[in-house]
Curated annotation (Swiss-Prot):
A lipid is attached at residue 23 (N-palmitoyl cysteine). GO terms for cellular component: plasma membrane. A lipid is attached at residue 23 (S-diacylglycerol cysteine). InterPro entries: Csa, Csa_sf. Belongs to the staphylococcal tandem lipoprotein family. This is Uncharacterized lipoprotein SAR0402. It comes from Staphylococcus aureus (strain MSSA476). It is a lipid-anchor. Its main location: membrane. It is found in: Cell membrane. The keyword Signal applies. NCBIfam families: SA_tandem_lipo.
Amino acid sequence: MGYFKRVLLYIIVMVLSVFIIGCDKSSDTSEKSKGDSKEAQIKKSFAKTLDMYPTENLEDFYDKEGYRDGKFKKGDKGTWVIRSEMTTELKNENMVSKGMVIRLNRNSRTCTGEYFVRIVKEDSEGKVYSDERKYPVKMENNKIIPLKPIDDEKVKKEIEEFKFFVQYGNFKELENYKDGEVTYNPEAPIYSAQYQLKNSDYNVEQLRKRYNIPTQKAPKLLLKGSGNLKGSSVGYKNIEFTFVENKEENIYFTDSVYFNPSEDK
């Protein structure tokens, strides 16, 4: 059940990865050299994004400039989109994702978003479907505030205590991560680098402090993005910590910080 649920989210990336890995086997020596080079390029591509971790005061993003392309209209200062999400699926249970996304508009210096709870289920016929509840929020003085009354005290507390990973994550040790599993497709273009972490890793310790992670397995860190590695930084940059991934169970945390054109321009 878990396998099919996650395939819904990652099938495109997985198919491309299989193709790339298959091609990489043609020449071990030459491809290892290329892989090492690509690993360095991927780290460099992520460097400016990861330098924003940590930004404890989210209102600092109102004064942060991001990468622009032709989609930005004249005079648009842009909007930062920040998202953090924890997903847990234990054996014979539904997949539950909880997280928040906010949009910080640099033109109006206002921030709105939503806290969400998504449950992915499988019916008696084997069909997988998603049930999602969203709770609109705003941010004032670096504090997340619900826009509507919430009867569920548990959800209300989760919103009050919520912190985005960009507020406490830290990647100052990125250069010490070595021998990553690298994939790269220049035609898409998409790329990724994956590293096995230890439970003593700072970011892993921080995640365990904030979430009930029902496994002692150390996670893998996956950096995946799109765009031209040789220059353009326009594209997405996603971070994922995968603790468990198999056909019966999935436990992973995802995070992203995007810079997009504003909808009010």
